[in-house]
Amino acid sequence: MNRFIAFFRSVFLIGLVATAFGALPARAANETAPDYALSMHGDVALPADYTHFPYTNPDAPKKGSLTVGVVGTFDSLNPFVLKSMRTTARGLYNDGEFGNMVYQTLMLRSRDEPFTLYSLLAEKVAIDPERKWVEFTLNPKAKWSDGQPVTVDDVLFTYDILTEKGRPPYNSRMSRVAKIEKTGERSVRFTFNEKSDREFPMLIAGSMPVLPKHAINRDTFGNSTLEPPIGSGPYVVASVQPGQRIVYKRNPDYWGKDLPSQRGFNNFDKISIEYYRNETSLFESFKKGILDIFIEGNPIRWEKLYDFPAVEQGKVIKDTFEKGTPADMLGFVFNTRRPIFADRRVRQALGLLFDFEWANSNLFAGQYRRTQSFWEGSQLSSVGRPADARERELLAPFPGAVREDVMNGTWHPPVTDGSGHDRVPAKKAYDLLSQAGFQFKDGMAIDPTGKPFAFEIMTRSPDEEKIALAYQRNLSRLGIAVEIHTVDDAQYQQRLQTFDYDMILGALASSLSPGNEQWLRWGSASRDVQGSFNFAGVADPAVDAMIEALLAARNRADFVSAVRALDRVLISGDYYVPLYHLPYQWVARWDRIEHPQKTPLSGYQLPAWWHTSQ
């Protein structure tokens, strides 16, 4: 399950991290003055003269190599277009594990704050107090890997070409920009229109790449390619074996190596990413020492299968990391574009039939915790809390959007006796399906059109198939016929992109600063946009209104209320059958690899690790 979540992180980097920090002002008294950082809400943690992020080791040796494995395949080095959105090699840009090795952004996000950006390609930033415009001054030292300077023209070109040929969300962002203008030799200003919001300047700064105008062919940009790209990042592509391996080499002339936001990162001379068909072969390669680290997501394996000699000899080290962000949402996703899942009562009924207690005990050694909220384990979660006055005000125009038990904070997923045969949730599911017009004849559930109730769960790994089989067994007790179809990675990505499935296991990374990415997950406008993350096909005015409210919030209290209100609407919509999460992050490593002592709020950070051998 861990790698399934990592995949979605690598495709679309989402906001991370949590809690409040010391009171260092993000700006001078004049908020429009150029500065070194931007914060979404409140203050930033680090002063203007900070030397490095506190979760890095600025004295880490720069040497050696890191070899890691991932499950899947790739056929492109272009992460910015729809055609190769989900088949691009890992590590190039916006990768949840490896960061931005080749392409960079104007500013870099700290992984130890809710949503704060620090100088990178832009050495200074100025912003209007109302966030109607933002202006960046480029670092004069910024260079592409071929030695050419990074210029304002590159920034202008990036927005032009991504609007014309880029994938979501890049292609739609210019719709919020009234104008982009060159205001100096190294400065560029974005002025926003009425479609913008308070978060949008942060996205311009921290989640839009800057591309080299001189090195990109506009006519072919929309195609997949295996040509090594020119970037401004710390690594260049050294070699490529399509679908099997990509090797990155640290650029010895990297322009930003002495920036405070870069010190302690990018310590390996070479990083190799090896592709495997499944986790079993990947784990065997790790045991043999072919791979340096193994990111573990299987509690049974973590508990029972690390008994090989290298572990006993202390050559392989098992690390446990705690993070401060909400747990990721993993669940069975109903594709509500399919008529069989259009009725919320049907989705609610099927949600009652997942037996977490049995699965956790029998499949996962009791290691998992049940996920209930889309912001599980954080102050943004609505679970266990009655809606406050501000939430009720936001939800008032949408009567019926939130179930009463969700509104008053008493809702929770069903808790079974763990036997695998608990009749209480089954009876509730039976009643809901009956209310929705289903009948039960000869051991089969018959839908309102007179057809047997049947659907497919699409999976892509043995781990996914295992939990789908457990769910299938429970559904069959009510006469629901479920077929589990495991497909290869290429077919999975294609069907995912075109929403060609009944049900999948979906994963969403969560943060304490949700924002515009919520439109791509839940917004009505994204329902039929290929490449969006609206896997459930949500199109609900109440959802849209809550997203607008969280983006318009000017203080933390209003923001929290808006997110909780969105959480309540999503839970009440029964779009996901929430599954489970691990309370920790597990990584096994050979002793030649080391990491900093401090773990930031978002968890371990591979770009800050290093090689220890002589």
Curated annotation (Swiss-Prot):
The keyword Protein biosynthesis does not apply. It comes from the Bacteria. InterPro entries: Peptide/Ni-bd, SBP_5, SBP_5_dom. One of its GO terms (molecular function) is peptide transmembrane transporter activity. GO terms for biological process: microcin transport; peptide transport. One of its GO terms (cellular component) is ATP-binding cassette (ABC) transporter complex. It holds the Pfam family SBP_bac_5. Residues 1-28 form the signal peptide. It is found in: Periplasm. This is Putative binding protein BMEII0691. It comes from Brucella melitensis biotype 1 (strain ATCC 23456 / CCUG 17765 / NCTC 10094 / 16M). The keyword Signal applies. Belongs to the bacterial solute-binding protein 5 family. Its main location: periplasm. PANTHER family: ABC TRANSPORTER PERIPLASMIC BINDING PROTEIN (PTHR30290:SF64), PERIPLASMIC BINDING COMPONENT OF ABC TRANSPORTER (PTHR30290). Gene3D superfamilies: Dipeptide-binding Protein, Domain 3, Periplasmic binding protein-like II.
